[in-house]
């Protein structure tokens, strides 16, 4: 079942993650905090990649849901089209264009850079 997510693409943070990824567990809380403390709830999208929906739901049940958008890319179509190398990986999208890629887990320094340099 393929559904579209309508978002304002003027500024989006897309995080690719998987339930089996230990580094994804660590950055999950950082992304939720980033979204909730910077009024970015509709701008942060966590996309489960290289995983299935059951494992993704179990991950979120174990580690919590934030007030952000969650999606599952079971076919890897979005990730492949976006040039994702693996998980975790985070893309900053401004006006529909990927302007920055963070390959590997985000840290506090990356979060500060996002807050200070992007809308």
Annotate each language-model stretch with its function.
Residues 22, 32, 99:
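Nucleotide phosphate-binding site architecture
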Residues 62-66, 73-118:
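Thiol/disulfide oxidoreductase modules built on the thioredoxin-like
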Residues 42, 68-69:
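Short, conserved active-site loop motifs that form the nucleotide-linked donor/cofactor pocket
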Residues 13-14, 44, 90:
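Hydrophobic beta-strand anchors of alpha/beta hydrolase catalytic cores
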Residues 1-12:
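A short beta-strand-turn-helix
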Residues 25-63, 74-80:
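Structural microenvironment flanking redox-active thiols in thiol-disulfide oxidoreductases
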Residues 16, 47-49, 95:
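Cofactor-binding loop segments of dinucleotide-utilizing enzymes, especially the Rossmann-like FAD-
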Residues 15-21:
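Aromatic-flanked redox-active Cys/Sec active sites in thiol-based oxidoreductases
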